């Protein structure tokens, strides 16, 4: 979450008059994250999150995100619910941006995830995958293989300013992933596609909610697993923590077992997930709007992660025995 667009108090008051949310007591911008402008609202009827959708989020995708949250909540996934106004609509406009209000979830995101957190995420992700199986609306993943080259092209001329040799490193990896090795026949469904630790809330070691579905789409379920290996199973020094990975994969597998083909593809999917976040971080790093209340994330973190995945030979390196759980 972040703030790119400021909202004046009188604009917000007019906006809230379209809802039955009580009187506004206070509001403040939320600085975390990099995609949209988010505000925490306190009213006489409770706390809510206001999101103004920016940058990569297309307005015609927003009904998908809002309907997905409603569907998942109705199928047992603890996630925010879109709030409808008096006219029955959840999506409207504020400060020239598409905007929506969602319910506030209790909990905090873990700054230092442990193995118990990773297990909670594994179980929660698997339950989300199962709950989304009969969701009728589809949205293609714009940030899969075909979307990586345009991101590279947008940043290539300045990539070596971030790290010497980065442009050539990225080009070589993109050439490999586009050479026909990317899987095409794995189980697909609705994926979160951005399940980092700041998008998962916990109360203690128990997962209390999953948030921020603005990258959700239809893609290989195992790709979502690979994203989480990148997001949850490395230490601050970027070394891979096999204990966390084992906890995550085992917990996922107890709810939804990975197929042999999914297991075999994990190293390749993890490489793809790593370069996807490396590229979007690189573009963001080079293009932060002046004065934005935002902290760009370090793209070089994902250079180190990608190099690790390039060295992986099988799922054993992730703590999982092929076609079976590790005790």
Curated annotation (Swiss-Prot):
Please verify whether the record's keywords include Translocase.
Answer: no
Q: Enumerate the GO terms in the molecular function aspect.
A: ATP binding; homoserine kinase activity
Q: Which organism is it from?
A: Bradyrhizobium diazoefficiens (strain JCM 10833 / BCRC 13528 / IAM 13628 / NBRC 14792 / USDA 110)
Protein name as annotated = Homoserine kinase
Q: Say which family it is in.
A: Belongs to the pseudomonas-type ThrB family.
Q: Name one Pfam family in it.
A: APH
Enzyme superclass (EC): transferase
Protein's GO biological process: threonine biosynthetic process
Q: Which InterPro entries match?
A: Aminoglycoside_PTrfase, Homoserine_kinase_II, Kinase-like_dom_sf, Pseudomonas-type_ThrB
User: What is this enzyme's EC?
Assistant: 2.7.1.39
Q: SUPFAM superfamilies of this UniProt entry?
A: Protein kinase-like (PK-like)
**Has the keyword Oxidoreductase been applied to this entry?**
no
Secretion signal, residue range per the UniProt entry: none
Record's PANTHER family? AMINOGLYCOSIDE PHOSPHOTRANSFERASE DOMAIN-CONTAINING PROTEIN, AMINOGLYCOSIDE PHOSPHOTRANSFERASE DOMAIN-CONTAINING PROTEIN-RELATED
- Domain of life of the organism encoding this protein: Bacteria
Segments forming a coiled coil? none
Record-linked NCBIfam families? PRK05231.1, thrB_alt
Q: In which pathway does it act?
A: Amino-acid biosynthesis; L-threonine biosynthesis; L-threonine from L-aspartate: step 4/5
Give the reactions, separated by semicolons, that this protein catalyses: L-homoserine + ATP = O-phospho-L-homoserine + ADP + H(+)
UniProtKB keywords: Amino-acid biosynthesis, ATP-binding, Kinase, Nucleotide-binding, Threonine biosynthesis, Transferase
